[in-house]
Amino acid sequence: MSKTEENFFEYLNFFEKSNINNRAFFIDKCNTFYSDDFVLKYAYNLDKNFFPFRDDLFSFKDSAFLLNENIKAYISNMSFLHKEFQSNNLLGNFSFSFFENDIIFMLPEIFLSFCILFSICFFVILGNSKKFKFPFLSYSCGLFFFYSFFLTFFLIFNSLNLDTFCFFFHFNNNFFTNLVKLFLIFSSFFCILFSLDYMKKDNLEIFEFFFIFSLSILGMFFLISSFSFVSFYLAIELQSLSLYILASLKKNSNFSTEAGLKYFILGSLASCILLFGISLIYGFSGIIFFDDLAHLNIVLFNFVEYSFFNGLILGLLLLSVGLFFKIGAAPFHVWIPDVYEGVPLLVTAIFAIIPKIVIINFILLFFSSFFSSFFFFWHKWFIFLSFFSFIVGTFGALYQIKIKRLLAYSAISHVGFLCLGLSLNTVEGFQSVFFYILIYVLLSILFFTIIFCLKRYNNNTRIYNILDLQNLFKVNPFFSLIFCLTLFSIAGIPPLMGFFSKFFIFLASIKESFYFISLFSLFLSVVSSFYYIRLIKLIFFEKNSSWIFLTPFSKNFSLILIFLTFLNLFFFFISCFFFRNSL
């Protein structure tokens, strides 16, 4: 190896160990000597170890990378740049501290991890203490995590506008990721309230539920902040393993055990497919960081053979299959109806609300920011998923008689709208997706609050069959009216909250001339209104020989119903008020 090459690799190895500010300074210094934009991008890519064959770079004389004269000039003059840095003693000004920034910027995750570890030690020891007569701790544990989430919410809110990389560029916290975390914690508050009331009324003492649920939330925090395939896979597996345990929460129930086993087997298969896709992307590019992959797609698009991009596309396809399995997009939906029906109602609420927040926003961030140059591929792939999800979700729900299976197919149909918005690759499309998932989660919380309230007074059993809703209006008119408004909103009837989420998706797709899929989704949205209207017909107009008397609602559920119903009814006026004040 020549002296020039030795200086080049010495300089390169140094900057691989430096932080992001040093990298920016390095690019700025290159700009002083070289004006060619491609050379600068190549230098930026190379200094972050883009290629697995970096050490053999100079042996590829016939490669398209080295045929470029600008790159040859860059390599030949690297020694001059290296001497310039040495003469000005610029290398000695750089420092890197692992704990200086990482703990501060990852404080919400670290705090939540500490709360989980502390609660496991404290509640397990106290719950098995003979001195305290083996106390029941589920309610106390639930309150502990409720306040822990409350403090975590303010820790995230305090760092909302920060934009930084943590743990050697494996995590990235910015405004978008922190906003998703805030919404995730907000939804978790309702799940904790659901669990406290559910365990109290059903006489359950499963305080382990709160540990596992908090672990899944922690995994979702890491998932939305992940900036490399390593952190991404570890985070999504932490979330998935926690959800596998939650699916089998009722150990004495055969339905819960069967649902947990189905979810575990199919979820493990999806994780294998996802890992295989990651390995293909890494094998063809040698890249684990997302921003490196984005730069590679942009900078080297015209300098590699088609087999390289075919490998990336195959890896991207397998990775998206694993992700869309997690949210239940058709045709990867086969686990949703059986799992939703078999798991306890509390776990069904978690499956329907929590994972979709993080995974949909991660897909939005990943494909729009790092794989935007592959729009020609994932645009068609998302349209196919949207088309298939509309069909399966709409027609699969028409003949369902159980509420949880009806909800499962309805969730598949909603994923179709999200895929339609993701396929647009426009700012309006991505904004409509984020707004849709926001409204979907709020309506899901409202719907599950209603389902939790449907409990018979005489035998203390829950209502899971839609035929049992007959004559409900005669028993509780106000509650039936709230139920009716919620169903209309989910169906997309104006001027309720659910209408605007679908309206913005349609508006963004028509703006991009997606006329056929827009009309098709609009038609199936009208068809899907049938099974919501059927529920309303049973509640208001069907006569039943027996009367359904419900148990009194808890104070927490009553407040949730009032608040979310008010938001559902007056969402248009509230949004107009805030928009006018922001101008």
Which role does the model predict for each range below?
Residues 2-17, 23, 31, 41-42, ...:
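Alpha-helical transmembrane segments of multi-pass membrane proteins predominantly involved
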